[in-house]
From Swiss-Prot:
Biased composition (Basic residues): 1-16, 24-44
Family assignment from sequence similarity: Belongs to the bacterial ribosomal protein bL34 family.
Tagged with keyword ATP-binding: no
Keyword DNA-binding assigned: no
InterPro entries per record: Ribosomal_bL34 (IPR000271), Ribosomal_bL34_CS (IPR020939)
Keywords recorded for this protein, A-Z: Ribonucleoprotein, Ribosomal protein
UniProt GO molecular function: structural constituent of ribosome
Annotated GO CC locations: ribonucleoprotein complex; ribosome
Record's protein name: Large ribosomal subunit protein bL34
Biological processes, Gene Ontology terms: translation
Species annotation: Campylobacter hominis (strain ATCC BAA-381 / DSM 21671 / CCUG 45161 / LMG 19568 / NCTC 13146 / CH001A)
Coiled-coil segments: none
Pfam families given in the database record: Ribosomal_L34
N-terminal signal peptide: none
Lineage summary: Bacteria, Pseudomonadati, Campylobacterota, Epsilonproteobacteria, Campylobacterales
Length: 44
């Protein structure tokens, strides 16, 4: 049985990347929350 998580950079960035987050109001909310918390990485 193969494992379910087979990571690929491009699809990951397309769905969870910074540019993608900035497109929606809620995405911007996510980034701002992570910024307020002091996360080193704001998006994937």
């Amino acid at each position: 049985m193969k494992r379910t998580y087979q990571p690929h950079t491009t699809p990951k960035k397309r769905t969870h990347g910074f540019r993608e987050r900035m497109k929606t109001k809620n995405g911007r909310r996510v980034v701002n929350a992570r910024r307020a918390k002091g996360r080193k990485r704001l998006a994937a």
